[in-house]
């Protein structure tokens, strides 16, 4: 049974998943370097244009738990196909003639993401060995980060050639291709799922609401606040305050997800060998604020750019640990890991909703980015709390056995 469960076909499954992860990332942050263009097009404020990110994350936040339930009931294979189709919503961008319609398109995309993220966790847990989970989470997150980096890198140059509407349309093609490929070749691991008892919402509520889940969720919120808030507004800050051309400013900020994309697999491999998760969370919580502050406070743009790159590197360490911990909690199965992951990500995404709106609105009010950036930069300290009080779930936990989750 074990040989069948962990067959070599799992790497084909991972390759198909990667296409969808890159497509997700490509569309997720691609509107952010285009904020000035979209603001001029629709004559809207910074706080309004922030909705293109915040509204997306709102629907992700609201839909994550229902998405986890959908996966448990419908199966990971069909759920991932639906997710890919929804994530291709940017194909409709040229049909929009108002900002409201553009926001609606982003909401549909967010629904797809809310299904795809927990479905990905469920599929990985179905197909891969426990010792491979950190590495696979690193590879998967690398695909998302690579997509984000490419989207932020090329959005402005492509817009200069074909316009922002056609740029977003072209980005919407990849998730649709990924959905088609997955529909043709993707499948659930029957040998894994048939070993589990029937899914019960009541049995899984303790996993979603226990103290460990809430601690990890609080840490997730801190890291997401910095990643999304700074990715959204640093291009505009560099352009407006430091006079850097928007295209170059976007390239600088794109180094954040690019570093994460490059280092996520390395982080996964190291954490597979290390066998510990708590030190990763604590270290990330202590260093993210330092590099976030450096990205806009230091006068040297070279040093600020290095800080942006370091933000991406530290985020790669955090995200691999944060996505692996739910898979290692005692009693969590492939049918329920989507729900646990969704519960953790819900708070993280809520912070992602608030962060860009907070920065945009407070900047409009104060006429300066400094205060909102400083506040957001300190939020990742919640990771230190999570790192201190979470039990160790890695293979090198006390006596080699993960500590049980506490209610």
PLM features per residue range, with description:
Residues 2-7, 188-216:
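Juxtamembrane intracellular "pre-TM" segments in multi-pass secondary transporters
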Residues 139-187:
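Helix-loop-helix hairpin linking two adjacent transmembrane segments in secondary transporters
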Residues 277-322:
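C-terminal transmembrane helical hairpin of 12-TM major facilitator-type secondary transporters
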Residues 31-32, 212-254, 261:
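Extracytoplasmic gate region of multi-pass secondary transporters
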Residues 107-143:
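Cytoplasmic helix-loop-helix junction between adjacent transmembrane helices
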Residues 73-83, 272-285:
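Cytoplasmic membrane-interface "Motif A"-like loop-to-helix N-cap segments
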Residues 333-366:
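A late C-terminal transmembrane helix in Major Facilitator Superfamily
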Residues 62-97:
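Conserved MFS/SLC helix-loop-helix module at the cytosolic interface between two early adjacent transmembrane helices
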């Amino acid at each position: 049974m074990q040989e069948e469960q962990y067959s070599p076909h799992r790497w084909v499954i991972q390759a198909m998943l990667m296409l969808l992860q890159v497509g997700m990332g490509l569309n997720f942050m691609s509107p952010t370097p285009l904020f000035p263009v979209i603001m001029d097009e629709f004559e809207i404020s910074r706080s309004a244009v922030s909705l293109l990110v915040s509204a997306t994350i709102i629907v992700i936040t609201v839909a994550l738990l229902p998405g986890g339930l959908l996966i448990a009931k419908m199966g990971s294979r069909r759920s991932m196909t639906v997710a890919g189709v929804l994530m291709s919503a940017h194909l409709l961008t040229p049909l929009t003639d108002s900002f409201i319609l553009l926001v609606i398109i982003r909401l549909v995309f967010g629904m797809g993401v809310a299904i795809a993220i927990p479905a990905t966790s469920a599929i990985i847990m179905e197909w891969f060995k426990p010792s491979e989970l950190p590495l696979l989470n690193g590879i998967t997150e690398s695909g998302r980060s690579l997509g984000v980096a490419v989207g932020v890198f090329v959005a402005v140059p492509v817009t200069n050639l074909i316009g922002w509407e056609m740029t977003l349309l072209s980005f919407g093609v990849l998730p649709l291709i990924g959905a088609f490929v997955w529909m043709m070749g993707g499948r659930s691991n029957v040998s894994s799922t048939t070993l589990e008892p029937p899914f019960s919402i009541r049995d899984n509520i303790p996993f979603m609401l226990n103290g460990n889940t809430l601690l990890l969720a609080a840490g997730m919120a801190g890291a997401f606040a910095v990643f999304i808030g700074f990715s959204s507004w640093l291009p505009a800050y560099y352009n407006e305050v430091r006079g850097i051309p928007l295209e170059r400013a976007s390239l600088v900020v794109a180094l954040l997800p690019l570093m994460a994309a490059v280092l996520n697999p390395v982080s996964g491999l190291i954490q597979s060998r290390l066998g510990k998760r708590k030190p990763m969370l604590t270290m990330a919580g202590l260093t993210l604020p330092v590099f976030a502050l450096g990205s806009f406070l230091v006068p040297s743009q070279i040093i600020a750019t290095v800080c942006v790159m370091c933000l991406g590197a530290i985020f790669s360490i955090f995200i691999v640990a944060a996505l692996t911990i739910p898979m290692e909690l005692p009693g969590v199965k492939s049918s329920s890991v989507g729900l646990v992951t969704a519960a953790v990500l819900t708070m993280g995404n809520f912070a992602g909703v608030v962060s860009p709106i907070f920065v945009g609105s407070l900047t409009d009010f104060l006429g300066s980015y400094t205060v909102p950036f400083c506040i957001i930069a300190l939020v990742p300290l919640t990771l230190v709390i999570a790192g201190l009080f979470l039990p160790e779930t890695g293979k090198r936990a006390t006596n080699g056995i993960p500590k049980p989750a506490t209610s």
